[in-house]
Every structure is written in C-alpha cells, then in structure tokens.
Amino acid sequence: MFLLTPVLVAVVCILMVWIFKNADGATKRREEEPRARAEARPWVDEDLKDSTDVLQVEEDADEWQESEEEVEHVPFSHTRYPEKEMVRRSQEFYELLNKRRSVRFISNERVPMEVIDNVIKAAGTAPSGAHTEPWTFVVVKDPDVKHRIREIMEEEEKINYLKRMGPRWVTDLKKLRTNWIKEYWDTAPVLILIFKQVHGFAANGKKKIHYYNEISVSIACGIFLAALQNAGLVTVTTTPFNCGPRLRVFLNRPANEKLLMFLPVGYPSKEATVPDLPRKPLDQIMVTV
C-alpha cells in the first residue's frame, strides 16, 4: 500500500489550497467583469427604450384595438428635376446643414411662433411605423415653466455627471466644456420637448400599437433639426437622462408618453462659441457595394 509521507502530505495540501484559491479568484473575476463592462458603458435611461411589444397584444388582447380601417390610395405627385438641378439643390442643402452646430449660447430674443409652427409641421412629415405618427411636441414659452424645467433637469444632470455617467463619459465631454449647469434653458425664448407615444388610443378607448415608436420619433427629430437650420435658428439636443418621468408629470402629459429629447430654440447670442470639431469625410461614413 502506498503511504503518504509527511512531506508529501504537506505538498498535497499546498497544491489543494492553491487550486481552490485560483478557482475562487477566477469566479470573482467572472463576476466582476460584467460589472466593470457595465460601468464602462454609458448609462442607459430605461425610460428611453423602445417599448414596441407585439406580445403584449396577445397577452392583453381585450385592451388593444386592431387596425381595420381602409385607406384610399391616390396617384403620387412628384417633381423631377434635371440632373444639374438635382446636383445643385443637393449641394446647397448639404452646405446649409453642414453649418449646423450645437449651440449652448442662446439669445433671449423673441422667435416668431409661425416659424416654430412650420418647423414642427415639417417634423410631423416624418415617416412612422404603420403611419402611427407617435410624437408630441410640447412648446414652452412661459418663463416660470422654463425655469422649473431647468431646475428638474439640472438636479438630475448633476447626479448624471457625478455618478451615473462614469469617468470615461465625463472625460469625453471635457472638450465640449459642458456640465450640469444649463443657463440656456432660461434664456432661450422657446423650449421644445419631444415625447414619443409608446402607444395610442382608438376612438373606443382601446390601446393602439405604435410600432417602432422611438425610431419614428427619432426620424422626426432629425427633420426638426434640419428645419430649424433652414429657418436660421439654433439649438442643442438634450437627452432626458432620468428626468423624463418628472418632466412628464410636471407638464401634465399622459402616461403613454415618454420624453425622448428636449431642445432650447432661438438665435445665437453675440458671444456664442462652438468647439472647432471636424466632421468625418464621405469615405468614412459611406460604403458603396
């Protein structure tokens, strides 16, 4: 029979301790890696996630309205330009939008409301899933309401900068010279808050699915920015990290609406500056197959 000598027993014990320690360390590393990766990623506001959920229709069928309406189809009216005219128009439109910048220094000079109306009507021409048009544009001009919006936003933004966003994100923003203090929310003559409707309501009170509501509203936001630039106004896009629910309640918006983006709108102040950032050239953003 094989007998374990004291030396051999000691070696075996040391080996077993080493194996267990390494196994325990590997387990801890596996547990910590996802947490570290999560902390390195930008913080995600759950309120901003697209809430299109077809399964919900099957689970709560009685609450949802199926679309049965018939829509007449009519001939499409189209203006076709000569090729040279197409090139000229496309180049001029590009040059116009290439001048668009995120401006954080906004004058308190009054903006014609007819211009705001037209800009929002232009945004409302955006395509949407099943033509549900799941957007609501809230226009705020009242100084007291604007100031309260600023207070709510700055309270949450301070937490974002100090805790939620993480050091990498905050470092990446340093070149833009931004922080949680947003004076332009008071000075801008108009604030536009853009809500996505996660579902709608039929005439009988039943819910209507708004397919791809966040993508649809995001397209409308892009057209909105282009229309502002075309009208000679400036803005800076702001995402409502964690202040969306509070602002929704403050503005008395219904529970089916979620704040997607809000923008101060006006003319640039005389002392306005912007970071001198280049845009990617065409060969870095386009692939032809």
UniProtKB/Swiss-Prot annotation:
EC numbers: 1.21.1.1
Tissue-by-tissue expression: Detected in thyroid (at protein level).
Biological process terms in GO annotation: thyroid hormone metabolic process; tyrosine metabolic process
Cofactor(s) it depends on: FMN
Transmembrane segments: 1-21
Cell compartment(s), UniProt: Cell membrane; Cytoplasmic vesicle membrane
A single cellular component GO annotation: cytoplasmic vesicle membrane
Catalysed reaction equations from the record: 2 iodide + L-tyrosine + 2 NADP(+) = 3,5-diiodo-L-tyrosine + 2 NADPH + H(+); iodide + L-tyrosine + NADP(+) = 3-iodo-L-tyrosine + NADPH; 3-iodo-L-tyrosine + iodide + NADP(+) = 3,5-diiodo-L-tyrosine + NADPH + H(+); L-tyrosine + chloride + NADP(+) = 3-chloro-L-tyrosine + NADPH
Swiss-Prot/TrEMBL keywords: Cell membrane, Cytoplasmic vesicle, Flavoprotein, FMN, Membrane, NADP, Oxidoreductase, Transmembrane, Transmembrane helix
Binding positions (3-iodo-L-tyrosine): A130, E157, Y161, K182
Residue numbers binding FMN: R100, R101, S102, V103, R104, S128, G129, T237, T238, T239, R279
Predominant location category: membrane
Molecular-function GO terms, alphabetical: FMN binding; iodotyrosine deiodinase activity; oxidoreductase activity
Topology in membrane: Single-pass membrane protein
InterPro entries linked: Nitroreductase (IPR029479), Nitroreductase-like (IPR000415), Nitroreductase/BluB (IPR050627)
Binding site for 3,5-diiodo-L-tyrosine: A130, E157, Y161, K182
Known role: Catalyzes the dehalogenation of halotyrosines such as 3-bromo-L-tyrosine, 3-chloro-L-tyrosine, 3-iodo-L-tyrosine and 3,5-diiodo-L-tyrosine. During thyroid hormone biosynthesis, facilitates iodide salvage by catalysing the oxidative NADPH-dependent deiodination of the halogenated by-products of thyroid hormone production, monoiodotyrosine (L-MIT) and diiodotyrosine (L-DIT). The scavanged iodide can then reenter the hormone-producing pathways. Acts more efficiently on 3-iodo-L-tyrosine than 3,5-diiodo-L-tyrosine.
Subunit and interaction comment: Homodimer.
Family: Belongs to the nitroreductase family.
Name of the protein: Iodotyrosine deiodinase 1
Organism: Sus scrofa (Pig)
